[in-house]
Amino acid sequence: MEETLSSQKLTEQNGMTVTPQDSIMSLLYQARWGDGSAYLKLADCYRDGIGVKKDFFGMITMAHMAEWRGAINRIDDYIYGLPDGSDYKTLFLLMDSYRSYIQEDPDSIEQELRTRDSPEAKTLLGMITVDQGDTISGINKIKEAADQGCSLAELLITIPDWKGRPRADATKLAIIAHRVPLAYLILGDLYYEPDDNGKSNMQLAVEYYMKAEEHAVLDRHGAERVLDYYRNGGNVQLTEDDVKRLELIVQPKSVETE
Protein backbone atom coordinates (compact mmCIF):
# COMPACT_ATOMS: atom_id res chain seq x y z
CA MET A 1 0.00 0.00 0.00
CA GLU A 2 1.49 3.31 -1.03
CA GLU A 3 2.12 5.75 1.79
CA THR A 4 1.70 8.96 -0.17
CA LEU A 5 -1.18 9.93 -2.37
CA SER A 6 -0.38 10.97 -5.91
CA SER A 7 -0.32 14.72 -6.34
CA GLN A 8 -1.68 14.18 -9.83
CA LYS A 9 -5.01 12.88 -8.55
CA LEU A 10 -7.20 15.06 -6.41
CA THR A 11 -10.80 14.15 -5.76
CA GLU A 12 -13.49 16.30 -4.30
CA GLN A 13 -16.50 14.70 -2.66
CA ASN A 14 -19.08 16.17 -0.33
CA GLY A 15 -17.06 19.36 0.01
CA MET A 16 -13.82 17.55 0.92
CA THR A 17 -10.66 17.15 -1.10
CA VAL A 18 -8.13 14.34 -0.96
CA THR A 19 -4.78 16.13 -0.96
CA PRO A 20 -1.19 14.97 -1.47
CA GLN A 21 -0.67 15.55 2.26
CA ASP A 22 -3.19 12.83 3.02
CA SER A 23 -1.83 9.31 3.09
CA ILE A 24 -3.72 6.06 3.34
CA MET A 25 -2.17 5.32 6.73
CA SER A 26 -3.07 8.79 7.98
CA LEU A 27 -6.65 8.47 6.76
CA LEU A 28 -6.98 5.01 8.30
CA TYR A 29 -5.71 6.39 11.61
CA GLN A 30 -8.27 9.20 11.52
CA ALA A 31 -11.04 6.78 10.54
CA ARG A 32 -10.17 4.44 13.41
CA TRP A 33 -10.72 7.34 15.78
CA GLY A 34 -14.20 7.93 14.42
CA ASP A 35 -13.59 10.57 11.73
CA GLY A 36 -16.38 9.99 9.23
CA SER A 37 -14.88 12.43 6.72
CA ALA A 38 -11.75 10.25 6.61
CA TYR A 39 -13.93 7.33 5.53
CA LEU A 40 -15.34 9.42 2.70
CA LYS A 41 -11.81 10.31 1.58
CA LEU A 42 -10.87 6.63 1.74
CA ALA A 43 -13.89 5.80 -0.41
CA ASP A 44 -12.64 8.36 -2.93
CA CYS A 45 -9.17 6.81 -2.84
CA TYR A 46 -10.58 3.38 -3.67
CA ARG A 47 -12.79 4.91 -6.34
CA ASP A 48 -9.90 6.59 -8.16
CA GLY A 49 -7.00 4.33 -7.21
CA ILE A 50 -5.22 7.01 -5.18
CA GLY A 51 -2.64 5.37 -2.93
CA VAL A 52 -4.47 2.04 -3.13
CA LYS A 53 -5.61 -0.29 -5.88
CA LYS A 54 -8.76 1.02 -7.55
CA ASP A 55 -11.50 -1.13 -6.10
CA PHE A 56 -15.30 -1.04 -6.30
CA PHE A 57 -15.84 -3.09 -3.15
CA GLY A 58 -13.28 -1.04 -1.23
CA MET A 59 -15.16 2.13 -2.19
CA ILE A 60 -18.50 0.65 -1.12
CA THR A 61 -17.04 -0.64 2.16
CA MET A 62 -15.61 2.75 3.13
CA ALA A 63 -18.79 4.57 2.08
CA HIS A 64 -20.81 2.19 4.24
CA MET A 65 -18.47 2.88 7.16
CA ALA A 66 -18.89 6.63 6.58
CA GLU A 67 -22.65 6.14 6.74
CA TRP A 68 -22.37 4.10 9.92
CA ARG A 69 -20.05 6.68 11.49
CA GLY A 70 -22.57 9.40 10.69
CA ALA A 71 -20.68 11.31 8.00
CA ILE A 72 -23.57 10.79 5.58
CA ASN A 73 -27.18 9.83 6.17
CA ARG A 74 -27.07 6.91 3.73
CA ILE A 75 -24.69 5.45 1.19
CA ASP A 76 -26.87 6.74 -1.65
CA ASP A 77 -25.78 10.27 -0.68
CA TYR A 78 -22.22 9.29 -1.56
CA ILE A 79 -23.11 7.35 -4.71
CA TYR A 80 -25.32 10.07 -6.18
CA GLY A 81 -22.56 12.58 -5.49
CA LEU A 82 -20.15 10.73 -7.79
CA PRO A 83 -19.46 12.27 -11.20
CA ASP A 84 -21.90 11.35 -13.96
CA GLY A 85 -20.39 8.68 -16.14
CA SER A 86 -18.49 7.07 -13.26
CA ASP A 87 -18.33 3.31 -13.89
CA TYR A 88 -18.68 2.58 -10.19
CA LYS A 89 -21.71 4.84 -9.88
CA THR A 90 -23.34 3.06 -12.81
CA LEU A 91 -22.55 -0.40 -11.41
CA PHE A 92 -23.98 0.46 -8.00
CA LEU A 93 -27.16 1.93 -9.50
CA LEU A 94 -27.62 -1.08 -11.79
CA MET A 95 -27.37 -3.49 -8.88
CA ASP A 96 -29.61 -1.30 -6.76
CA SER A 97 -32.18 -1.28 -9.56
CA TYR A 98 -32.03 -5.08 -9.79
CA ARG A 99 -32.62 -5.46 -6.06
CA SER A 100 -35.45 -2.94 -6.13
CA TYR A 101 -37.25 -4.37 -9.14
CA ILE A 102 -36.36 -8.04 -8.84
CA GLN A 103 -39.93 -9.08 -9.62
CA GLU A 104 -39.84 -7.17 -12.89
CA ASP A 105 -37.94 -7.88 -16.11
CA PRO A 106 -34.21 -7.74 -15.30
CA ASP A 107 -33.11 -8.26 -18.91
CA SER A 108 -32.15 -4.63 -19.48
CA ILE A 109 -29.94 -4.66 -16.38
CA GLU A 110 -28.22 -7.86 -17.50
CA GLN A 111 -27.71 -6.48 -20.99
CA GLU A 112 -26.14 -3.33 -19.59
CA LEU A 113 -23.79 -5.36 -17.39
CA ARG A 114 -22.75 -7.49 -20.37
CA THR A 115 -21.70 -4.38 -22.28
CA ARG A 116 -19.28 -3.45 -19.51
CA ASP A 117 -15.93 -5.18 -19.79
CA SER A 118 -14.92 -5.15 -16.15
CA PRO A 119 -14.53 -7.84 -13.46
CA GLU A 120 -16.95 -5.90 -11.25
CA ALA A 121 -19.68 -6.06 -13.90
CA LYS A 122 -18.95 -9.76 -14.38
CA THR A 123 -19.31 -10.28 -10.62
CA LEU A 124 -22.69 -8.57 -10.48
CA LEU A 125 -23.82 -10.54 -13.52
CA GLY A 126 -22.69 -13.73 -11.78
CA MET A 127 -24.67 -12.82 -8.66
CA ILE A 128 -27.81 -12.26 -10.75
CA THR A 129 -27.23 -15.58 -12.55
CA VAL A 130 -27.00 -17.43 -9.22
CA ASP A 131 -30.08 -15.61 -7.96
CA GLN A 132 -32.00 -16.78 -11.02
CA GLY A 133 -31.16 -20.41 -10.29
CA ASP A 134 -28.12 -21.15 -12.47
CA THR A 135 -25.64 -21.53 -9.64
CA ILE A 136 -22.86 -23.21 -11.61
CA SER A 137 -22.74 -20.61 -14.40
CA GLY A 138 -23.05 -17.77 -11.92
CA ILE A 139 -20.21 -19.00 -9.72
CA ASN A 140 -18.02 -19.56 -12.78
CA LYS A 141 -18.54 -15.91 -13.74
CA ILE A 142 -17.65 -14.84 -10.21
CA LYS A 143 -14.52 -17.03 -10.23
CA GLU A 144 -13.42 -15.45 -13.51
CA ALA A 145 -13.89 -12.01 -11.98
CA ALA A 146 -11.90 -13.05 -8.91
CA ASP A 147 -9.05 -14.21 -11.15
CA GLN A 148 -9.16 -10.75 -12.75
CA GLY A 149 -8.66 -9.10 -9.37
CA CYS A 150 -12.18 -8.17 -8.24
CA SER A 151 -12.16 -8.17 -4.43
CA LEU A 152 -15.94 -8.59 -4.15
CA ALA A 153 -15.67 -11.73 -6.28
CA GLU A 154 -12.78 -12.98 -4.12
CA LEU A 155 -14.98 -12.58 -1.07
CA LEU A 156 -17.96 -14.30 -2.67
CA ILE A 157 -16.05 -17.42 -3.70
CA THR A 158 -15.12 -18.09 -0.07
CA ILE A 159 -18.70 -19.36 0.29
CA PRO A 160 -18.47 -23.08 -0.58
CA ASP A 161 -22.21 -23.77 -0.64
CA TRP A 162 -24.75 -21.23 -1.85
CA LYS A 163 -27.69 -23.39 -0.80
CA GLY A 164 -29.31 -22.91 2.58
CA ARG A 165 -27.44 -20.66 5.02
CA PRO A 166 -24.18 -19.53 3.37
CA ARG A 167 -21.11 -19.91 5.59
CA ALA A 168 -17.75 -18.71 4.33
CA ASP A 169 -14.64 -20.89 4.28
CA ALA A 170 -12.31 -19.59 7.00
CA THR A 171 -9.15 -20.82 5.25
CA LYS A 172 -10.03 -19.00 2.03
CA LEU A 173 -10.98 -15.87 3.95
CA ALA A 174 -7.63 -15.82 5.75
CA ILE A 175 -5.81 -16.01 2.41
CA ILE A 176 -7.54 -12.94 0.96
CA ALA A 177 -7.85 -10.85 4.14
CA HIS A 178 -4.75 -8.74 3.47
CA ARG A 179 -6.32 -7.72 0.15
CA VAL A 180 -9.94 -7.59 1.35
CA PRO A 181 -9.84 -6.35 4.97
CA LEU A 182 -13.56 -6.93 5.53
CA ALA A 183 -12.63 -10.62 5.56
CA TYR A 184 -11.09 -10.04 9.01
CA LEU A 185 -14.49 -9.00 10.33
CA ILE A 186 -16.18 -12.04 8.77
CA LEU A 187 -13.49 -14.29 10.27
CA GLY A 188 -14.15 -12.77 13.68
CA ASP A 189 -17.84 -13.58 13.37
CA LEU A 190 -17.10 -17.11 12.14
CA TYR A 191 -14.88 -17.99 15.09
CA TYR A 192 -16.99 -16.19 17.70
CA GLU A 193 -20.26 -17.87 16.78
CA PRO A 194 -20.66 -21.63 17.38
CA ASP A 195 -20.00 -23.81 14.34
CA ASP A 196 -22.04 -26.86 13.32
CA ASN A 197 -20.49 -28.77 16.22
CA GLY A 198 -21.36 -26.06 18.72
CA LYS A 199 -17.73 -24.97 19.13
CA SER A 200 -16.35 -21.43 19.03
CA ASN A 201 -12.91 -19.85 19.46
CA MET A 202 -13.38 -16.48 21.12
CA GLN A 203 -9.67 -15.75 21.45
CA LEU A 204 -9.06 -16.20 17.73
CA ALA A 205 -12.26 -14.28 16.97
CA VAL A 206 -11.02 -11.32 19.01
CA GLU A 207 -7.66 -11.40 17.22
CA TYR A 208 -9.45 -11.14 13.88
CA TYR A 209 -11.77 -8.43 15.16
CA MET A 210 -8.73 -6.39 16.16
CA LYS A 211 -7.21 -6.91 12.70
CA ALA A 212 -10.46 -5.52 11.31
CA GLU A 213 -10.10 -2.56 13.68
CA GLU A 214 -6.56 -1.93 12.38
CA HIS A 215 -8.05 -1.61 8.90
CA ALA A 216 -10.94 0.60 10.11
CA VAL A 217 -13.67 -1.90 9.21
CA LEU A 218 -14.72 -3.16 12.65
CA ASP A 219 -18.43 -2.79 13.33
CA ARG A 220 -20.26 -2.15 16.60
CA HIS A 221 -21.14 -5.81 17.11
CA GLY A 222 -17.50 -6.89 16.84
CA ALA A 223 -16.30 -4.07 19.10
CA GLU A 224 -18.84 -5.04 21.76
CA ARG A 225 -17.63 -8.63 21.64
CA VAL A 226 -13.97 -7.60 22.02
CA LEU A 227 -14.72 -5.33 24.98
CA ASP A 228 -16.87 -7.99 26.63
CA TYR A 229 -14.14 -10.61 26.20
CA TYR A 230 -11.49 -8.21 27.51
CA ARG A 231 -13.49 -7.06 30.54
CA ASN A 232 -14.29 -10.63 31.49
CA GLY A 233 -10.62 -11.58 31.70
CA GLY A 234 -10.15 -12.95 28.20
CA ASN A 235 -6.68 -13.66 26.85
CA VAL A 236 -6.16 -10.43 24.92
CA GLN A 237 -3.90 -7.45 25.49
CA LEU A 238 -5.41 -4.07 24.69
CA THR A 239 -3.81 -0.68 25.11
CA GLU A 240 -5.67 2.25 26.60
CA ASP A 241 -6.05 3.66 23.09
CA ASP A 242 -7.41 0.33 21.84
CA VAL A 243 -10.12 0.45 24.48
CA LYS A 244 -10.95 4.08 23.68
CA ARG A 245 -11.30 3.32 19.97
CA LEU A 246 -13.48 0.29 20.66
CA GLU A 247 -15.67 2.40 22.91
CA LEU A 248 -15.98 4.99 20.14
CA ILE A 249 -17.18 2.26 17.79
CA VAL A 250 -19.78 1.07 20.31
CA GLN A 251 -21.15 4.59 20.77
CA PRO A 252 -24.35 5.39 18.88
CA LYS A 253 -23.61 7.40 15.75
CA SER A 254 -24.63 11.00 15.26
CA VAL A 255 -24.80 12.51 11.80
CA GLU A 256 -22.05 15.07 11.29
CA THR A 257 -23.20 18.53 10.35
CA GLU A 258 -21.23 21.60 9.49
Residue ranges and their predicted role:
Residues 6-9, 21-24, 28, 40, ...:
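Alpha-helical tetratricopeptide repeat
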Residues 23, 59, 105, 109, ...:
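Single-residue signature of alpha-solenoid repeat helices
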Residues 27, 63, 109, 113, ...:
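Hydrophobic/aromatic packing residues within the alpha-helices of TPR/SEL1-like helical repeat arrays
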Residues 32-35, 48-50, 67-72, 83-87, ...:
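Short helix-capping/linker turns of helical repeat alpha-solenoids
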Residues 41-48, 77-81, 93-97, 127-131, ...:
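Hydrophobic face of amphipathic alpha-helices that form TPR/SEL1-like repeat modules
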Residues 57-70, 146-147, 203-217, 243-252:
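TPR/TPR-like (Sel1-like) alpha-helical repeat modules
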Residues 224-258:
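Terminal, low-structured helical/coil segments at or just beyond the last alpha-helical repeat
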